[in-house]
Regions:
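Alpha-helical transmembrane segments of multi-pass membrane transport and lipid-handling proteins
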Residues: 78-103, 109-112, 153-157, 161, ...
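Hydrophobic alpha-helical transmembrane segments
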Residues: 108-115, 143-189, 204-208, 244, ...
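Membrane-proximal transmembrane or re-entrant/amphipathic helices at the cytosolic face
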Residues: 398-405, 426-479
Length: 479
């Protein structure tokens, strides 16, 4: 299956998940009180960390390896299952201590219930990896959509019946249970019970998986350090403003890069020895991501003040100033976040781990320096740290696929030129539009957005041959 087909089905699944998230926000928030949501948020701190270490990078190893036998898959299955059981037992044993730390007695029962998702999801991680390895993303999308929709309907029903936080707990359990059953049904592979572990096979993937697990842990802590430092040294209102800006920045970027990297990984892994195919596929992927991200984030930065005030209210004004720096940061991160896929496909998770350590040192230094001044300076330093981190990461990435930074910059330069022209046009028309509509009205915001989007679209048709060919050929999204 091609990258386009992979991305198409991953995107459909992701859109449904986002829709389910919106239902959670809009409808469940009306039925479940904030205090109950808070309990689930506490539980998710533990659950998300558990999910991070659940498979120790072994599922990625199944996808990455050019040739893999059933013995290694079987060993990975049993290792994951025991890891899932181990994490669940740890959560059960430590739930009173976790509850005491958060000063929330109800958290004990929530953690006891939700811990079941670890053995459930672990028992199907090998099956999911095999489906992804074979690019069966249409089947995966069908499974994830079905599980998401059924899960949210059950949550709505339970919330209506005043189950409170347990509506969210059961939504999570139902999603994992249904996904597990369907992944088992979709994959023909079955575990063997006579010899659970082939230690020679596990030894083969140990280096790949260990480095990937360490990178994931480093990345998890470095990405959450900013909120911890701001919360420790600045006012809670400042942390709130920063968190909102960060979520606004991250929401579209996370969705785009998740779709791209999940669809890209099996394709790159199969072509890991064909450097020309690898380079072309990766550069095309980066081009597609930046084609959307550059105008989106540039426009958001330019219109941050009216956008924030109109959508969130005047009390969030500080968020608009932070967005001026986090929006361009998102452009850099949208490229950096794809780099892990290439290093994984090439089996060089050792380089990925070292880059993770470098990134953590840069980000932590930026956070520690920035917090001494103001939240705006904090955001500026974060932006500069991303720029510094970009060059060694992309230099090493292009090097292992027999390319160079010049090829990367040459590929994406037209997009940045188009984005710059779009901002210049928006700057020129801003005053005339402001004379027609007040800056803090939806009429002004929508008009400016339309002008920016139209400018960018026209430039894309004129300057970019692939976009022109795509439109002229009228390639459907779903074929």
């Amino acid at each position: 299956m091609s990258l386009f087909n992979n991305a198409r089905w991953v995107a459909i699944s992701q859109v449904v998940k986002i829709f389910v998230q919106l239902i959670n926000i809009v409808y469940l928030a009306r039925l479940i009180p904030p205090s109950e949501y808070g309990i689930m948020a506490m539980a998710l701190v533990i659950i998300n960390f558990g999910m991070l270490i659940r498979d120790l990078g072994t599922a990625a190893a199944i996808i990455q390896r050019k040739d893999i036998d059933s013995k290694i898959i079987n060993s990975i299955f049993w290792l994951n299952l025991y890891m899932g059981l181990g994490i669940a037992i740890c959560i059960v044993l430590f739930s009173p201590l976790i509850s005491y730390f958060f000063r929330e007695p109800k958290l004990i029962m929530v953690l006891l219930c939700i811990s079941i998702i670890f053995p459930l999801s672990s028992s199907s991680s090998a099956h999911l990896a095999l489906l992804e390895r074979d690019s069966k993303f249409k089947k995966i999308a069908s499974i994830e959509i079905t599980s998401s929709v059924i899960g949210v309907f059950i949550a709505l029903f339970l919330a209506y019946k005043s189950f409170g936080v347990y509506s969210l707990v059961w939504q999570t359990i139902i999603f994992n249970a249904l996904s597990t059953i369907q992944f088992w049904k979709a994959s023909k592979w079955r575990p063997a019970f006579n010899k659970m572990f082939d230690f020679s096979g596990l030894k083969e993937i140990f280096g790949f998986s260990a480095h990937l697990s360490i990178f994931n842990l480093i990345n998890y802590f470095s990405r959450n350090a900013d909120s911890f430092i701001i919360g420790r040294y600045m006012a809670s209102s400042v942390l709130g403003a920063y968190s909102l800006a960060y979520r606004i920045m991250l929401f579209p970027i996370a969705s785009l890069t998740f779709v791209a990297t999940r669809a890209l990984f099996p394709i790159l892994s199969k072509n890991q020895d064909d450097h020309d195919a690898l380079k072309k596929t990766y550069l095309d992927c980066v081009f597609a991501i930046l084609f959307i991200v550059v105008p989106l984030m540039s426009g958001l930065a330019f219109l941050s003040k009216p956008f924030v005030i109109l959508v969130f209210g005047k009390e969030w004004l500080l968020t608009s100033s932070i967005l001026l720096w986090l929006a361009p940061t998102a452009i850099i991160q949208s490229v950096l976040s794809t780099s892990g896929t290439v290093f994984m496909a090439k089996g060089r998770t050792d380089i990925l781990m070292k880059l993770g350590i470098l990134g953590m040192l840069l980000y932590m230094s930026a956070f520690i320096l920035g917090v001494q001044y103001s939240i705006i300076t904090f955001a500026k330093f974060y932006f500069f740290a991303n720029i510094i981190n970009f060059f060694p990461a992309m230099y090493l990435l292009m090097r292992i696929i027999n390319g160079n930074l010049f090829e990367l910059f040459k590929k994406v330069l037209p997009i940045f030129c188009m984005g710059l022209i779009m901002i210049v046009v928006m700057f020129i028309v801003r005053k005339p539009i402001n004379s027609l509509f007040d800056e803090f009205t939806f009429s002004f915001l929508l008009t400016m957005t339309f002008i920016g989007a139209t400018t960018y679209f026209i430039l894309a048709i004129v300057l970019l041959k692939p976009v022109r060919a795509f439109i002229l050929n009228k390639v459907p999204f779903i074929g």
